[in-house]
């Protein structure tokens, strides 16, 4: 007779097969059978987040680097707390497995008041995930887990939730039900005729524009070949670094700059690779993109979603761009005059941003000088993150400047923790504001406990700075509800056992950041913006909001 193991043990063993390095979660009576199995086997690290939102965000960050993030939450309120972070993982296209509990099978959907019960949990998980499954039969647990992981890792990737009733987690199943991992679905290879047609269009263009999004994160080599040949490249903020900012053909992410928009208008062909052309990067879709326009996307439903396309090629960006790059022969587009115009446009955009940032441009430069070349900037949705953090801070490669794509505040700290655990040999800077940090402040304890290699940079302006800017611009300067009482973050960090610095003069940026970033492990730098000066920002350029 086959050896019997619990479903919790089967889950732990299955995750090991996928080389899962860490599980992020909050321990609960509704996930203890899984937690116990993971703990006994001692092969997967468990990171005890202080809230479910933080745990899923940490797993999201980890999954962006490793190819699979794993989070574990409790039933009901615990699963509900995870929804915002699942929405972010959906926007980022992160391969993520979210394991959560359910009431005992006999009481499912009975509305009896069973502890942690919530009405129709599976429905809100479906709404916030790529897919959501319920395990109703212990013998199907491993099969459903394999299917969920395959779904999460199949482009377009996204979070997949699996709810498991507590009694099924502890139920015994035969060890023989453990099966090998499912292979990832193969990339959609482009048909030769499609490549031929696209190459003909590209070759005919005098000055093509390549717009890169997160779907092209693995296309760096092909993109560089095309850029070397003279294709002008611009990226979404998620696509930063696919082509290094230092490349002569890179417009970086300056799509909202007048000088860059003027240059774009001189192009005569647009190739969009793996980008949704989001509202905040196209002035709410009023930015004129050159025609003809061709789009590469793995998702057929993305065709002409935000801009009318002349053609949409359903294919893997890496495969199709590589096929184009193979046909390149030396420099084929542009010339020295175009290079000069492009350089001038980028320099004008950067100078305009530096002027807007004022003294804080020095902070950007101080971090750039002190952070190792392979260091990673993780930024919350904050004024500093949206200004100098988003576009002024250079990206040398993909996933070196990451953020919340859904635009929700509060994810910077847990995202930095997950990034650091996924990249233990690299230094991470977590750029947050005092307002956003308050939403996940408890994760400061997680940072300390896990000794993550993060320097948390807290831009403290005593409230919601972006709301002040929006109220100034759209509401006649009337200021309501944007002031926040916040702690002395330096003392709070020290109370957590963290090394911490406080900066109230721009002249000290270089010295403090050099010292902080040279120290391994977690630390905190609080920048007191009230003494240095405010940053004014009313959101990205777009049509009138109100």
Locate the predicted segments by residue.
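Active-site diphosphate/adenylate-binding microenvironment
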Residues: 8-19, 26-29, 34-41, 341-419, ...
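Thiamine diphosphate
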Residues: 32-116, 266-269, 274-278, 304-306, 312-314, 318-322, 386-464, ...
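Glycine-rich, acidic loop regions that bind phosphate or pyrophosphate groups
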Residues: 100-143, 237-339
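Phosphate/pyrophosphate-binding active-site segments
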Residues: 2-3, 139, 175-177, 200, ...
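Glycine-rich, anion-gripping cofactor-binding loops and their flanking helix/strand elements
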Residues: 64, 214-294, 394-426, 440-441, ...
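Conformationally flexible catalytic loops at phosphate/diphosphate-handling active centers
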Residues: 119, 147, 151-204
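Glycine-rich phosphate/diphosphate-binding loops that line cofactor/substrate pockets in enzymes
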Residues: 10-20, 61-66, 151-156, 194-209, ...
């Amino acid at each position: 007779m086959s050896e019997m193991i619990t479903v919790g043990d089967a889950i732990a063993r299955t995750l090991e097969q996928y080389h899962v390095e860490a599980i992020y979660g909050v321990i609960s009576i509704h996930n203890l059978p899984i937690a116990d199995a993971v703990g006994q086997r001692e092969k997967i690290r468990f990171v005890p987040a202080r809230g479910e939102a933080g745990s899923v965000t940490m797993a999201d960050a980890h999954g962006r680097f490793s190819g699979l993030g794993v989070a574990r939450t409790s039933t009901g309120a615990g699963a509900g707390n995870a929804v915002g972070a699942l929405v972010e993982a959906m926007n980022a296209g992160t391969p993520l497995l979210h394991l959560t509990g359910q009431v005992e099978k006999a009481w499912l959907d009975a509305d009896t008041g069973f502890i942690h019960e919530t009405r129709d949990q599976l429905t809100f998980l479906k709404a916030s995930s790529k897919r959501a499954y319920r395990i109703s039969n212990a013998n199907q647990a491993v099969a459903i887990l394999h299917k969920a992981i395959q779904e999460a890792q199949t482009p377009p990737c996204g979070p997949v939730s699996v709810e498991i009733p507590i009694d099924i987690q502890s139920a015994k199943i035969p060890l023989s039900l453990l099966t090998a991992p499912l292979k990832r679905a193969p990339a959609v290879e482009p048909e030769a005729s499609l490549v031929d047609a696209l190459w003909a269009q590209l070759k005919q263009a005098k000055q093509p524009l390549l717009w890169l999004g997160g779907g092209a994160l693995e296309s760096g080599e092909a993109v560089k070949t095309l850029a070397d040949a003279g294709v002008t490249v611009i990226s979404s903020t998620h696509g930063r670094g696919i082509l290094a900012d230092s490349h002569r053909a890179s417009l970086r992410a300056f799509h909202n700059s007048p000088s860059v928009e003027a240059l774009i208008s001189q192009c005569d062909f647009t190739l969009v690779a793996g980008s949704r052309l989001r509202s905040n990067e196209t002035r709410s879709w009023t930015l004129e993109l050159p025609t003809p326009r061709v789009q590469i996307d793995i998702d057929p439903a993305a065709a002409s979603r935000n801009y009318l396309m002349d053609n949409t090629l359903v294919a893997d960006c890496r495969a199709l761009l590589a096929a184009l790059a193979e046909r390149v022969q030396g420099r084929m587009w542009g010339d020295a005059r175009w290079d000069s115009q492009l350089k001038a446009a980028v320099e004008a955009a950067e100078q305009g941003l530096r002027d807007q940032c004022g003294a804080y441009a020095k902070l950007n430069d101080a971090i750039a000088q002190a952070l190792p070349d392979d260091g990673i900037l993780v930024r919350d949705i904050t004024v500093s993150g949206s200004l100098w953090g988003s576009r002024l801070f250079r990206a040398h490669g993909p996933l070196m400047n990451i953020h919340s794509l859904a635009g929700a505040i509060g994810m910077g700290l847990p995202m930095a923790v997950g990034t650091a655990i996924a990249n233990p040999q690299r230094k991470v800077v977590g750029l947050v504001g005092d307002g956003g940090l308050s939403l996940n402040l408890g994760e400061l304890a997680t940072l300390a406990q896990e000794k993550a290699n993060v320097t948390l940079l807290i831009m403290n302006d005593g409230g919601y700075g972006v709301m002040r800017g929006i109220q100034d611009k759209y509401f006649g300067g009337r200021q309501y509800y944007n002031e926040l009482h916040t702690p002395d973050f330096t003392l709070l960090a020290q109370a957590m056992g963290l090394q911490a610095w406080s900066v109230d003069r721009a002249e000290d940026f270089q010295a403090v950041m050099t010292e902080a970033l040279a120290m391994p492990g977690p630390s905190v730098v609080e920048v007191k913006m009230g003494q240095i000066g405010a940053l004014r920002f009313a959101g990205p350029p777009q049509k009138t909001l109100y």
